[in-house]
Amino acid sequence: MLACYAPVPAFLLPPRRIGWTLRLGSAVLLALLQGAVQAATPDWSGVWAMQGGTVFDLATQTGKGGSTTPGVREHPPYTPAYEAKYLANMALRDKGILPDPNSFCGIPTGFPRILNLPDVYEFAVTPQQVWIIAENGPNVLRIYTDGRAHPAPADRWPTHTGDSVGHWEGDTLVFDTVSLHSSENGRTLVDRTGLMLSEAAHVVSRMHINAAGLMEVQMTIDDQQALSAPWVVTKQFKQQDKGARVYDYACNENNRNPVDPKTGWTYTIGPDGRIIDQSATKK
């Protein structure tokens, strides 16, 4: 004989049983909500490698449409003052004496250069934060996605990676970055060609996996001091084979070659500790 059981009305349950039932129901609901949020974030696991060279934007080296006319560049749309600064940096670069702190592990890479490094990356996604982790350095860009805003202007200051807050539009992460160091006074350059930004830089990035399976980050850079128009740059990353690893890489451990503070030359040191090139004699 089958027995049928009707649910017991809440008013007939002992008070202790009612409280336990409510707590259990709340816990189940919270777990379901957390699972739904977790399921809503994309799977960006694995190891990724940047595509292309370490020039931040190839259009800074070529003319419109890829033209290679000497002295003609499409980007960046610098103001006259920053165009002069960039030309001065390129002149130093051509002599091999560009003072780039990142080339000798002097400071953290910073943003947006953190998206322009030759080694591999991991993209860690949680409902509250997204981390862009570069093997090189290592360097980390933290993006808050928990609904918070930037700190008030009085409560923030320039840093290497700035302050980033973001939100999801489907599978696309949209994040806003402010409070970046200027590229002057020994701070990080945007790339090895001498590209620069000011402390007024404001970057809006859109990050997603495109139809070709590449991680794509499109950055729109506004800088009222350095740029006369928005500067749009896109970087792409390819997922590596399953099982690829991010290795322990401490840049400073390999920083054994001194830099001449007068000329900017980096000396090459041999096994016996002596300089083995003629950099110091070059002008």
Predicted regions and their residues:
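PEST-like low-complexity, intrinsically disordered acidic/proline/serine-rich tracts
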Residues: Q38-K283
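Bacterial N-terminal signal peptides
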Residues: P9, P14-G19, R23-G35
